[in-house]
Amino acid sequence: MSEAIIAKKAELVDVVAEKMKAAASIVVVDARGLTVEQDTVLRRELRGSEVEYKVIKNSILRRAAEKAGLEDLASVFVGPSAVAFSNEDVIAPAKILNDFSKNAEALEIKGGAIEGAVASKEEILALATLPNREGLLSMLLSVLQAPVRNVALAVKAVAESKEDAA
């Protein structure tokens, strides 16, 4: 291979390794068999959630994973691989890809990484069942509001009972 090609591939490895280091979550899938229309819809959904989705050669992915400290992730880079990176929402790529795979059986989740730790296919699927960030925040808010609401209702009940007694 010419030195220019080797340099270009080394640069690509560096770019992918940086994306892997910066990502909150990484999901690796086998998208072989998706139609162009399905792939376009999937990419649009992922882009809407600020998830970057790329088809990258396995040799480059293996080298980038090594460089990013995710050596154990190399075992999923077998066969055609596409990678979804999310820097913000840990759940988004897993949720979108899992939901999409229910309608498009050709899409298969292979594994990934969560917050810099390698995750198996089962762990990625478990992550996909969690509510998204907004859902988790609303659950937290309702848990925090419950005691205040209970105190307010108790005070209101006491006030009403005193009014009835008077």
Curated annotation (Swiss-Prot):
BP GO terms, sorted: translation
InterPro entries: Ribosomal_uL10, Ribosomal_uL10-like_sf, Ribosomal_uL10_bac, Ribosomal_uL10_bac_type, Ribosomal_uL10_CS_bac
Molecular-function annotations in GO: large ribosomal subunit rRNA binding; structural constituent of ribosome
Keywords from the UniProt entry: Ribonucleoprotein, Ribosomal protein, RNA-binding, rRNA-binding
Chain coiled-coil ranges: none
One of the Pfam families matching this protein, by short name: Ribosomal_L10
SUPFAM superfamilies attached to this UniProt entry: Ribosomal protein L10-like
Entry GO terms, CC: large ribosomal subunit
Function: Forms part of the ribosomal stalk, playing a central role in the interaction of the ribosome with GTP-bound translation factors.
PANTHER family xrefs: 39S RIBOSOMAL PROTEIN L10, MITOCHONDRIAL
Family: Belongs to the universal ribosomal protein uL10 family.
Quaternary structure and interacting proteins, as annotated: Part of the ribosomal stalk of the 50S ribosomal subunit. The N-terminus interacts with L11 and the large rRNA to form the base of the stalk. The C-terminus forms an elongated spine to which L12 dimers bind in a sequential fashion forming a multimeric L10(L12)X complex.
Entries under NCBIfam families matching the protein: PRK00099.1-1
Name of the protein described by the UniProt record: Large ribosomal subunit protein uL10
Organism of this sequence: Streptococcus pneumoniae serotype 4 (strain ATCC BAA-334 / TIGR4)
